[in-house]
Amino acid sequence: MITWYGHACFKVDNVLIDPFVPNPLCDLPYDEIMEGVEVIAVTHGHADHLGNAEELAKTYNVPVVTNHEISVYLSERGVCAEGMNIGGTIEINGAKLTMVKAEHSSDISPTISGGVAAGFIINDRVYHAGDTGLFGDMELIGEIYAPQIALLPIGGRYTMGIDEALVAIELIYPEIVIPMHYNTFPLIEVDVNEFVKKAEALGVEVIVPKIGEPLEL
């Protein structure tokens, strides 16, 4: 089951990723978003991804899985946080998460390091790319993990845009692609229908979810 809450925030099975909620695309209540969530995963330290992880983790007594530096930061603030790094795998509360490379920055603030940005393979079938530019080792992610579903940023400016995301699809070659990280703010506004048309021409299924509506995939 996959549910999109705008920007890069998804619920994948029992894992909530990058909990930037509320956001300009989503004003759903916490109780609805956190229903069934047993793990929070954070790809990097920027505010639109670390989001409300601290508040949600404390309120709902849910552990946070993230890179080592962010886990230390959260632990010092009273959060149950599990640190890991790129290439590592953790199994927690019935979820399996493997941290993979991303090309992006990650500072929590100008004075607090957020380690390095990353993506996740969730339960061996979903690839959440995090914030990233295009990089050649996406081909290795496709070869090694063979994700059925890829959640890819398309908004440009701070991540891949549409054209780069299309190349990423050819490197990873998942069965299903779900676009993310677009139209949240004016700087990352794109025509998602353009992406859908071009991606489908590559032979993959593209799904543009409605906010808060679960997809049985």
Swiss-Prot record:
One Pfam family per UniProt: Lactamase_B_2
Keywords for the protein's UniProt record, in alphabetical order: Hydrolase
Annotated GO MF terms: hydrolase activity
InterPro entries: Metallo-B-lactamas (IPR001279), RibonucZ/Hydroxyglut_hydro (IPR036866), UPF0173 (IPR022877), UPF0173_UPF0282_UlaG_hydrolase (IPR050114)
Domain of life assignment: Archaea
Stated family: Belongs to the UPF0173 family.
Name of the protein in question: UPF0173 metal-dependent hydrolase MJ1163
